[in-house]
């Protein structure tokens, strides 16, 4: 039987019911050996694993997959948290002396819907609006959970080609640019000549789910300690957790695999990089240059560093990574006449 209040955080499991296909609720608490709950900013779902020791009624015989599990947990802040997850897996089953143990895998209901849905229709607009539309559309995910987004300043058009909804949203993350503190501007000339432009702002979003709902947020907003990039302006550090006492936001362990590697950073173009594009329809060749020294103040930063040191400024002077790609503005134009390459 699971022992409640067995951790420093004093979490209480107050409810754990499995609803079978007939609608009957089965209390799983007496047989629970362990529960592991997972959230990650890299995953568009929450999941859990329950280890069951079953010596009485064989609950496993009632499970066929897709059942709801209602879970309530009392936290150290004296607030009760409620979760409704779906059974997607039963495994690691063993039987000995009329006692069987097994794992029940739980996941968000939307994740099961995601696996059964494919999107083929082209989607146009701001990435954050596209993500929200996919999640709310009654013909796609149709979630009733809250959705939190950081507004994007760029528009895009995506051709999913039968990809799953979550895959489509994840594909928008790298090319999404937050509207706050961005200096990217459209082209102001139709000349088919080389133009060197400064690429500003900080691209990069993450799509994930936690107990509050779905998030399509810019990395800058998540790292925002000053409230300048759409974030809350509050970051809880490991030191805060150690000195601030026990609560639901306490960080109990931190592992840094790699912190500083200048060679790796230079090869990735962390300090300065260049993007070269060639439009095969218009013949226009453009060059976009990213320089960390110029863009430092347009980004949010974690840690104690408030400015670049001399060597970092020097490493920002020349692009250390050059990327090139072929584009075709006609591909994203819906009209019947010739598209204007300078019309966003």
Mark where each language-model region is.
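Assembly/oligomerization scaffold segments
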Residues: 1-116
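An acidic/polar, Gly/Ser/Thr-rich interaction patch typically located in mid-to-C-terminal regions
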Residues: 34-62, 239-344
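N-terminal export/assembly leaders
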Residues: 47, 114, 131-160
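Short beta-strand-centered interaction patches in the first periplasmic/extracellular domains
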Residues: 101-104, 108-110, 147-273, 278-280, ...
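PEST-like low-complexity, intrinsically disordered acidic/proline/serine-rich tracts
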Residues: 118-120
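Stable alpha-helical elements in mature extracytoplasmic
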Residues: 126-131, 165-169
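Short alpha-helical segments in extracytoplasmic peptidoglycan/chitin-binding modules
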Residues: 134, 172, 323
């Amino acid at each position: 039987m699971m022992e409640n209040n067995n951790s420093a955080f004093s979490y209480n499991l107050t409810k754990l019911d499995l609803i079978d296909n007939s609608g009957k609720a089965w209390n799983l608490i007496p047989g629970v050996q362990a529960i592991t709950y997972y959230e990650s900013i890299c995953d568009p779902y929450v999941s859990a694993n329950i280890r069951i020791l079953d010596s009485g009624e064989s609950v496993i015989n009632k499970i066929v997959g897709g059942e709801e599990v209602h879970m309530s947990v009392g936290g150290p802040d004296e607030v009760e948290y409620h979760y409704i997850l779906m059974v997607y897996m039963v495994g690691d089953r063993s039987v000995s002396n009329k006692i069987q143990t097994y794992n029940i895998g739980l996941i968000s209901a939307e994740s099961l819907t995601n696996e059964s849905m494919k999107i083929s229709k082209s989607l146009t607009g701001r990435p954050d609006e596209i993500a929200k539309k996919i999640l709310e559309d009654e013909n796609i995910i149709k979630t009733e959970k809250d959705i939190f987004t950081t507004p994007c300043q760029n528009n895009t058009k995506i051709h999913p080609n039968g990809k799953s909804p979550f895959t489509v949203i994840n594909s928008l993350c790298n090319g999404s640019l937050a509207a706050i503190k961005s200096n990217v501007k459209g082209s102001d000339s139709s000349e088919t000549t080389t133009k060197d432009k400064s690429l500003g702002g900080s691209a990069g979003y993450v799509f994930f789910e936690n107990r509050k709902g779905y998030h399509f947020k810019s990395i800058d907003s998540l790292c925002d300690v000053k409230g300048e990039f759409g974030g809350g302006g509050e970051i809880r550090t490991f030191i805060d957790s150690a000195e601030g006492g026990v609560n639901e936001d306490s960080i109990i362990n931190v592992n840094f695999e790699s912190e500083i590697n200048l060679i790796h950073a230079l090869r990735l173009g962390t300090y300065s990089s260049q993007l070269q594009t060639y439009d095969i329809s218009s013949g226009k060749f453009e060059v976009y240059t990213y320089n960390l020294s110029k863009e430092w103040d347009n980004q949010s930063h974690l840690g104690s560093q408030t400015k670049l040191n001399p060597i970092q400024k020097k490493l920002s002077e020349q692009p250390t990574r050059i990327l090139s790609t072929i584009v075709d503005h006609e591909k994203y134009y819906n009209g019947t006449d010739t598209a204007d390459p300078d019309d966003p």
